[in-house]
Amino acid sequence: MPEAVARERIRLVALDLFGRLGEDRVSMRAVASASGCTVGLVQHHFGSKQGLRIAVEEEIVEQFTDALSQGPGDRASRDARVQEMFAQRPEIVSYLRRSLLDRPDRASEPDGILTRLVAMCRDQVRIMRQSGHARTSASEEEQVLRMLTRAFGVLFLEPMVTAVWGELDQPDETRPALRVTLT
């Protein structure tokens, strides 16, 4: 298996395992086994478990950046692309739910996923403001908060909304759409 392919496979397997089980419950050996390689190869590519986590989170930030920056720049289109990315990459959803809810302290560390997503969103807000796709009457900080709240609000609340709707014995096609906004 070529090195780049092996590295990507290991990273994808780690993303899936970390999302399903939690990073603290997944060993480098488990990642290696599920990837069909040796622990030495995982260490060769990522150095340590922290290096592997950082690589996993870099992939998530890259996917977010792509969703926000490709296509029309209006808010509704950006939000739809983020939700589409979540639908296409459920392992990212699992990872974000677990890391942001189970380990908010780690997510907010200097190399944590939340810290990097906030920085990426700030960059995107600046680009959108310069291109006229975001208003300048609101602060950058407010726009970053709104952007992440719209994305994560749906991400975190969707399982509860689905469960409640199921308890009400209503057909899925009549379920109201979930939207999250700050006022």
Question: PLM features: residue spans?
Answer:
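An amphipathic alpha-helical core segment
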Residues: 145, 149-157
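Short helix-capping/turn signature of helix-turn-helix
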Residues: 46, 98-104
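Helix-turn-helix
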Residues: 5-9, 13, 17-51, 55
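Alpha-helical DNA-contacting segments of helix-turn-helix folds
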Residues: 53-60, 117
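A detector for short, charged/polar N-terminal pre-domain segments
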Residues: 1-2
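Amphipathic alpha-helical packing segments from all-alpha helical-bundle domains
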Residues: 65-69, 105-133, 138-145
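Hydrophobic alpha-helical connector segments
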Residues: 55, 65-98, 120, 140, ...
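C-terminal peripheral helix-coil segments that are non-catalytic and often amphipathic
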Residues: 84-87, 118-131, 156-183
